[in-house]
Amino acid sequence: MRVLHAVTLHSTTHAFGGPVRVALNLCGSLRERGHDVRLTALADGFRRPLPEEVEGVPARLHQARRVLPLGFSGLTSPSLLAGARRLVRQADVVHVHLARDLVTLPVALAALRAGRPLVLQTHGMVDPSERLSARLLDAVAVRRVLRGAAAVLHLTAHELRDLDAVVGGAGLDRAVRLVNGVPAQPEGPAPEGPPRILYAARLQARKRPVDLVDAAPAILARHPEATFVVAGPDEGELDAVRRRIDELGLAAKVSCPGPLDAARMTEELRKAHVYVLPSVDEPFPMSVLEAMAVGTPVVVTDSNGLARDVDRAAAGRVVSGPDGIAPAVLDLLGPSVRRSASAAARKLTAETFAMDAVVGTLLDVYERAYTGSQA
């Protein structure tokens, strides 16, 4: 099957985060099964000529251009817009990782106009909004593509309710739950040396990286040799993180290495004794799945989409707010507790979030979409 995946942005800083990681994981697994899969996206930070593949996946990348002061939503590319129709006509199924932007929406509209089966995956990015730009895009395009898609993939019941609210009326009638999958990782040795606590996600307000810095003194009181890593592309919180590090006198204990590529991310996760993601209302974070896949116990908040799974499997700890982070980390640093949580984390990802099962479900969706388009 010929499948086109469209995602907003692939950059050297990995600024678009989880949706790109999900798209690449799916593309790689589909290619392993013999399917002809291609990726299209904007590109930023690369030297010319732009890469023609990403992690082994053939890619048609277009230099990002900012046309509106709206974050990722204000980026586009004339060449991508001009070539969208040709790209979708070459595919049997078009899979769009949909956001309210000037990349994925035009590709989705092109697929509908070309009569190609359209599968949408929103990653929690399309929810009810009072912003004028969101309301305009919803009226002009978002509702149209959601209603016209052969399938709309959602992660959680909360996300589905949001999508129904955006669509209005009776809501979606072609919704399919598809969890994020994570590739299997070989079991490695437990991390050695002093405790190492990791945060690796975008540095933005909702993800609350400062909360980990605030938890550091209480952890250091019990483990004075511990170190902390706050990694990820800056989306407005790096200055606040650095300011808090200075205020608490933690410059020798907390490092901020910036964005991590896929290989470095895996390396850092393996070196970490505990992975902490303090974010609120996080739909289904790939970084937490990746941490558990290598056996690193996690600390997440109770509004995290994976909180129930983590709690039930005892693959880490779930906290209600910032004050719970330090006690949770200290608990997981106990040798026997960490060993148990590490084994549980690997078991959870292998049994519940394995790529084989996720891709099997996705291929069923593709087959139904393609067959329906031929009827």
Name the predicted role of every residue range:
Residues 297-301:
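Short hydrophobic beta-strand element within catalytic cores of glycosyltransferases
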Residues 200, 227-242, 258:
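Glycosyltransferase donor-sugar binding loop
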Residues 4, 189-216, 229:
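Conserved donor-binding/catalytic core segment of Leloir-type glycosyltransferases
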Residues 312-323, 331-336:
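Conserved acidic donor-binding segment of nucleotide-sugar-dependent glycosyltransferases
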Residues 280:
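Aromatic "clamp/platform" in nucleotide-sugar-dependent glycosyltransferases that forms part
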Residues 241-260:
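Nucleotide-activated donor-binding/catalytic signature segment of Leloir-type glycosyltransferases, i.e.
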Residues 7-13, 28-75:
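N-terminal strand-loop element at the rim of the active site
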Residues 135, 141-187, 257:
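Donor nucleotide-sugar binding/catalytic pocket of nucleotide-sugar-dependent glycosyltransferases
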